[in-house]
């Protein structure tokens, strides 16, 4: 790995940790603890706290934060679970699927209509309200991160997960997703946009080849800019 790649990887890792710190209430401490663990000092910005924490972590702890477990542990059937690191004051981190509400079979949560119906209203406030309620339920159930919203473009009506998205219009998709993310994160839960660009089929999606014309890619996926 080149020096620039290492710097980029470290920057992305630090940014991810900063996001977790900013949205996870568990990252608070007393004055005494903040002295021995400077990343627990809430007077610092999330970025500053993340940088101090990353500097204190060894390689195994960094790998731990990037891997975790899937569908195992005390929070089964959560989508993902990262056990705590007590020596650093890092709490457990629970992830659940969430494009249409919290998917967690252990506890009850509201099953919202398919996001495609929100897009049919042309009203971002509806997507924002769903995001806020889903975020509040996730927080109440002990979930820190939701895998949602989904805002890939529904280019193929036969796509098995098209119902999770906001339809085929790029700008509308970006607008609805923006409102949903803001609503979700207002509850203190991390939103996760999905799925990756040109992921338009579920079967063999990790090994299939998506051939997109050079013109279609920037035109059809301008919703990414709309979200930014």
Residue ranges and their predicted role:
Residues 3-14:
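Bacterial N-terminal signal peptides that target proteins for export
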Residues 14-24:
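Bacterial N-terminal signal peptides
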Residues 26-27, 31-225:
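Glycoside hydrolase catalytic-domain context in secreted enzymes
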Residues 1, 23-27:
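Intrinsic disorder/low-complexity segments
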Residues 228:
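A short, basic/aromatic helix-end/turn motif that makes direct DNA contacts
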